[in-house]
């Protein structure tokens, strides 16, 4: 299942609507279990790098995302600031 990670910092509705238009099944989730069991992940984001990182850490999903992507090699697509936070650091505030 494609899982769109909801960490309260993204354009989740736009993404799910695009998948519906394409006839692709995807779920929106804040659940560690769903992230751990996803076949692919989408990490949306709107706003600044710092704000997105704060929301991601506050969500409690960072360890699950790291495990899924870095250890299990689950493909991830970052959109907008969701792509930026896949990096180690940013000069953006």
What is the predicted function of each stretch?
Residues 25, 40, 75-77:
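Structural signature of beta-strand start/N-cap positions in the alpha/beta core
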Residues 26-37:
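Short acidic low-complexity segments
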Residues 2-24:
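N-terminal beta1-alpha1 ligand-phosphate binding loop
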Residues 21-28, 59-60:
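Short gly/ser/thr-rich secondary-structure transition/capping motifs
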Residues 10, 33, 47:
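Short alpha-helical
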Residues 35-45:
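Short acidic/histidine-rich motifs immediately flanking catalytic phosphotransfer sites
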Residues 47-93:
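Cysteine-nucleophile active-site neighborhood
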Residues 21, 37, 70-71:
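Residues at the C-terminal ends
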